[in-house]
């Protein structure tokens, strides 16, 4: 007999235990002790109101474990639960697979909905407006055809979101028709009753569980501090893939201004060369068009200054800049244009025009404020820098971020909600079996102060499934002879695994040099090389890798984590260097200086734990199921030569380790 707790909810054992609801429904379900332990702890945290950090090894089934806690609260009617993920893949897994599976076995019903950012939804009123103005809004081949395809889709779609659209429209076309906060007539709109965005919002209001991504969660947290919101009220937060939240918070609590973004914004208002844009049709808009031309000219001068500064000085400083490092000839021009659009909004009799003008004025106002903020460097505790990218180094980004995002996250998240559960396969930099101490580094980075921790190890048999090879005789990675020696070692291990390998780097420059040295040899061995940065995006590289035998993928940062290749396609992961962050990045430099000022040793309190967590992520690419087997190879001899090296080995699951000398292999 299965006992229910009524308004107390549904306990973890009743759902996931050996004789629970899931096991009764699916005979092939294996009740895992680690999953059950995690589910109980999540349930306890949410019932008793404390924060919890859980490191759940690969194969634990952590989504079922935290969903058990969420369902318990939903059935007990204790409040709405927000589940946040970093990747779309995990969102889809939750909404399309895991949650429906549990809805199937839980007699007391609960509802779950996926939350998308407002810009993912079509606005029918703006679609009509764009259709009327299309000859002047769109200039490139195919854009008007895309608009027609969107209009046809709008008649049949139930969802009205970009992911439901069968074509991939250009950013210009979608921006002209997407739902926007400052460009919404609300209940006054003739389409309000059938509005895709508001329909989705109403379903979120009634859902027990909302699934969102980290970017949407932090947008909501930032807006709530200003008295607004993009999500309905929720009472509990579960953050999966939580190791990414520091980086997401950097973006949301910092500044990001792109040269392309400014030019694109101005072009959408009026492109002087093509005579297209929102202001192109109105003979009364000549003054505003002149202001757009002036903004274009000022932007060219401004970014030419930035580019010259970077070439002469900035590159040596890693891009870090001082206040007023270039003259501000742009923000006052943006202000003039903003005031011009505000004036036009007041004078026009066309309500649709009015909303468009007001929205652009808001965007210009935000840009103007951020530009002044960046140049004056008004925020204490932030670092400001310039990034220059692209083949001709013409993509310019102005960036700022807090040196310590912890206080920001603490204030907006941990102080606001009684129970926040954070989970990932890589949160702790301590050894297996260690409890809270290993989590203190992560907790300190994200402002998590009063919390409990759980390390739920993997159910996989790593001692049987993995062999770790360490090249103990290779030169130090900073030695000039390292790349040549590393290439010879890479050849050995690729022959041993027949390709089917990830080779993980910490820099593009070393990746490119290694690829150039090995390209012909790989061709001779009939192994196909996929090198990141050669034109294919990450998703296409992965699809290609999985479908081809004897494939070798060279990857940097984005391939160390969040990549899932189960089965024989991936049998070898080669880690070229221990993944210490490059210390010449302004943000890393600033954090190192801050720690020195606090009297700490930045290597042991920041650089080493960061590298250990990333090393765990790289190691974790190999074993994704209980039948996977293979090797992990470390070419960085510091892991056996330096006293700190043993901390890397202690942090990964226990497996067979072999230190190889040049003669041994």
Label every model-predicted segment.
Residues 459-460, 471-481, 533-639:
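Conserved RecA-like P-loop NTPase helicase motor core
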Residues 48-69:
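Walker A/P-loop
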Residues 506-533:
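Conserved helicase motor "Helicase C" RecA-like lobe of SF1/SF2 P-loop NTPases
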């Amino acid at each position: 007999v299965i006992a229910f707790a009524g308004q107390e909810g549904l306990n973890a054992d009743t759902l996931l235990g050996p004789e629970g609801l899931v096991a009764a429904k699916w005979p092939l379900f294996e009740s895992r002790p680690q999953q059950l332990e995690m589910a109980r702890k999540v349930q306890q945290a949410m019932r008793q109101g404390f924060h919890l950090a859980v490191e759940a090894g690969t194969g634990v089934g952590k989504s079922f474990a935290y969903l058990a806690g969420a369902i318990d609260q939903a059935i007990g009617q204790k409040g709405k639960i927000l589940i946040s993920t970093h990747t779309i893949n995990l969102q889809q897994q939750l909404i399309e697979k895991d949650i429906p599976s549990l809805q199937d076995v839980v007699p007391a019903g609960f509802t779950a909905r996926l939350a998308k950012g407002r810009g993912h939804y079509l606005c029918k009123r703006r679609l009509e407006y764009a259709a009327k103005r299309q000859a002047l809004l769109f200039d490139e081949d195919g854009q008007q055809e895309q608009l027609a395809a969107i209009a046809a889709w709008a008649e049949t779609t139930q969802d009205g979101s970009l992911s439901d659209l069968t074509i991939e429209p250009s950013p210009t076309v979608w921006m002209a028709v997407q739902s926007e906060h400052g460009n919404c007539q609300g209940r006054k709109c003739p389409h309000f009753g059938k509005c895709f965005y508001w329909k989705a919002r109403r379903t979120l209001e009634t859902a027990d569980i909302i699934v969102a991504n980290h970017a949407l969660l932090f947008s909501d947290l930032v807006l709530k501090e200003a008295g607004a919101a993009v999500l309905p009220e929720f009472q509990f937060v579960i953050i999966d893939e939580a190791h990414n939240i520091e980086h997401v918070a950097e973006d949301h609590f910092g500044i990001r201004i792109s040269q392309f973004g400014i030019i694109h914004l101005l072009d959408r208002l009026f492109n002087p060369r093509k005579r297209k844009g929102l202001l192109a049709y109105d003979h009364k808009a000549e003054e505003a068009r002149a202001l757009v031309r002036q903004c274009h000219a000022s932007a060219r001068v401004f970014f030419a200054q930035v580019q010259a500064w970077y070439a002469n000085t900035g590159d040596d400083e890693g891009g870090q800049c001082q206040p007023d490092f270039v003259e501000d000839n742009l923000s006052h021009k943006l202000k003039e244009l903003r005031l011009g659009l505000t004036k036009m909004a007041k004078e026009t009799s066309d309500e649709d025009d009015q909303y468009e003008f007001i929205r652009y004025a808001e965007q210009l106002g935000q840009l103007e404020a951020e530009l002044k903020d960046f140049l004056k460097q008004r925020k204490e505790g932030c670092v400001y820098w310039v990034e220059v990218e692209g083949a001709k180094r013409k993509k310019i980004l102005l960036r700022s971020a807090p040196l310590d995002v912890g206080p920001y996250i603490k204030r907006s998240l941990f102080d606001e909600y009684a129970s926040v559960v954070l989970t990932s396969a890589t949160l702790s930099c301590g050894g297996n079996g260690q409890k809270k101490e290993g989590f203190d580094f992560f907790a300190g980075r994200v402002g998590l102060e009063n919390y409990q921790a759980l390390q739920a190890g993997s159910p996989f048999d790593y001692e049987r499934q993995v062999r770790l090879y360490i090249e103990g005789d290779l030169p130090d990675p900073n030695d000039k002879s390292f790349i040549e020696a590393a290439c010879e070692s890479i050849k050995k291990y690729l022959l041993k695994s027949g390709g089917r390998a990830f080779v993980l780097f910490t820099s593009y420059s070393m990746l490119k040099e290694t690829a150039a040295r090995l390209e012909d040899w790989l061709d001779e061995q009939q192994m196909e090389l996929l090198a990141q940065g050669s034109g294919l995006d990450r998703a296409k590289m992965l699809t290609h890798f999985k479908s081809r035998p004897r494939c070798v993928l060279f990857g940097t940062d984005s391939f160390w984590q969040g990549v899932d290749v189960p089965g024989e396609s991936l049998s070898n992961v080669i880690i070229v260097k221990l993944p210490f962050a490059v210390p010449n990045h302004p943000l890393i430099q600033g954090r190192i200086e801050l720690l020195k000022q606090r009297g700490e040793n930045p290597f042991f309190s920041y650089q080493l734990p960061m590298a250990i967590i990333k090393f765990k992520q790289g190691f974790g690419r190999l074993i994704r199921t209980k039948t996977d087997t293979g090797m992990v190879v470390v070419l960085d001899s510091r892991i056996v030569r330096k006293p700190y090296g043993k901390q890397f080995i202690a942090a990964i699951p226990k497996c067979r380790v072999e230190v190889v000398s040049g003669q041994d292999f």
